[in-house]
């Protein structure tokens, strides 16, 4: 097997993670989970990855033990999926799902190290892109698997039994991934062969585009440890410019808005609109495909135009599209036309997310002083994950009262974030114009 053979094993695990990202919330709804607790489920999942990334990243950095850490993380993910499939107790499902995303976060910084093996530093950003590609296709494959499996088996087996059987299949996929990884992962390097963490962080910071894993589960933890390992909060805070401070305030606000929308959404689609599990998977897949198809195009636009301006456009679109999902449900409930319109809305949500995600790294890099650019990118990852988790819990609470209220608040928060980014955009443009030399 060539040096990238282990990536096939990780792609297989990504299939299980992609399917599980929606399957577990749908299973939670099917066993009677309420709206607020669904928000807690999503919030715990969003927050669980960061501790895993920091713990496993530090161990891998200090000891060089990569193989055992990857296998341990895959083992924890397998255990988590089995635990969820064997219980109908909401708190146990929340705990199992938290363990799943702890494991997913834990393996991410270790894979970042593995993908650089045998290559020179200048090629590392391209290697990170290879890892993201395998992971992204696996994630999308998991959504396709969920769509097909639940559409075919929910009728004969019943909704809960079909979902449990898919959880078992996902657990088996991660278990097989661990077996293949044990065969194909490269050996742990000697101390002399280990790349310095500062070089890894520098290469990650050069990767100007953040990975777009999914419009529905946007935060990846692969960067978090490497970009924050040398973080000194006081030093970084002292170097924050007013524009960067405002931008991070915007990030908090619009990621809370994203969480408010996605947190209670599975329950709204399945219970309020009466969509079958396969149809919900289809909508999420459409959103992820929209992101994937627009990723390169958004990157090309960001190289020609202001990333801040493009991000404002993406945020304004999301601000309108979040309440649009509830409006479609009110105006065209449980109709073929309503379903088709929702499909278009979800595709546009994915496109808008691609624009936001691709431009984020460029905006942070432009606003941060050179000395703290890596740390600023790490803070972006950490803040976005935490804000998304808080938003998910808030969305679950609001959705318990009214989904139109929840999605309206989500849109309003994203709109406020867009206004703050527009302030940064205008301020940056003014500085750029005023700093241009006068012509003779």
Briefly describe each language-model feature range.
Residues 52-65, 294-307, 399:
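Helix-to-loop junctions at the C-terminal end of transmembrane segments
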Residues 68-83, 309-325:
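Structural signature of the two symmetry-related core transmembrane helices
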Residues 96-137:
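Cytoplasmic helix-loop-helix junction between adjacent transmembrane helices
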Residues 129-150, 383-391:
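Glycine-rich segments within core transmembrane alpha-helices of 12-TM secondary carriers
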Residues 146, 150, 171-194, 205-219, ...:
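C-terminal membrane-cytosol helix-exit motif in multi-pass small-molecule transporters
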């Amino acid at each position: 097997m060539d040096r990238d053979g282990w990536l096939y094993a990780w792609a297989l695990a990504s299939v299980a993670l992609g399917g599980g990202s929606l399957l577990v919330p749908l299973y939670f709804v099917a066993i009677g989970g309420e709206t607020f607790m669904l928000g807690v489920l999503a919030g715990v999942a969003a927050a669980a990855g960061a501790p895993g990334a920091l713990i496993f990243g530090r161990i891998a950095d200090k000891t060089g033990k990569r193989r055992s850490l990857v296998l341990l993380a895959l083992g924890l993910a397998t255990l988590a999926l089995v635990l969820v499939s064997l219980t109908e107790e909401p708190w146990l499902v929340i705990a199992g799902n938290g363990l799943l995303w702890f494991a997913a976060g834990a393996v991410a910084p270790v894979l970042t190290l593995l993908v650089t093996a045998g290559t020179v530093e200048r090629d590392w950003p391209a290697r990170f892109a290879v890892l993201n590609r395998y992971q992204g296709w696996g994630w999308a494959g998991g959504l396709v698997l969920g769509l097909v499996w639940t559409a075919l088996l929910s009728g004969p087996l019943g909704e809960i039994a079909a979902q449990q059987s898919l959880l078992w299949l996902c657990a088996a996929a991660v278990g097989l991934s661990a077996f293949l990884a044990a065969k194909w992962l490269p050996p742990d390097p000697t101390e002399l062969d280990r790349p310095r963490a500062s070089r890894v962080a520098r290469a990650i910071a050069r990767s100007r585009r953040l990975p777009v894993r999914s419009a529905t589960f946007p935060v990846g933890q692969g960067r978090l440890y490497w970009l924050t390992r040398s973080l000194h909060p006081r030093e970084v805070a002292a170097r924050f410019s007013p524009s960067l401070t405002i931008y991070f305030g915007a990030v908090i606000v619009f990621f809370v808005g994203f969480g408010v929308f996605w947190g209670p959404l599975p329950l709204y689609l399945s219970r309020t609109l009466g969509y079958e599990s396969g149809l919900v998977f289809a909508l999420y897949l459409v959103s992820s495909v929209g992101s994937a198809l627009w990723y390169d195009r958004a990157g090309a636009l960001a190289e020609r135009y202001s990333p801040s301006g493009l991000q404002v456009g993406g945020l304004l679109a999301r601000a309108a599209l979040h309440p649009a999902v509830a409006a479609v449900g009110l105006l065209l409930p449980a109709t073929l036309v309503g379903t088709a319109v929702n499909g278009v809305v979800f595709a546009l949500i994915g496109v808008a997310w691609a624009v936001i995600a691709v431009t984020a790294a460029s905006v942070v890099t432009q606003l941060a002083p050179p000395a703290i650019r890596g740390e600023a990118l790490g803070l972006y990852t950490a803040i976005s994950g935490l804000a998304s988790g808080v938003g998910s819990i808030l969305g679950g609470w609001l959705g318990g009262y009214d989904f139109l209220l929840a999605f309206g608040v989500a849109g309003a928060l994203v709109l406020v974030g867009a206004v703050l980014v527009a302030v940064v955009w205008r301020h940056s443009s003014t500085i750029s114009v005023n700093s241009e030399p006068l012509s003779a």
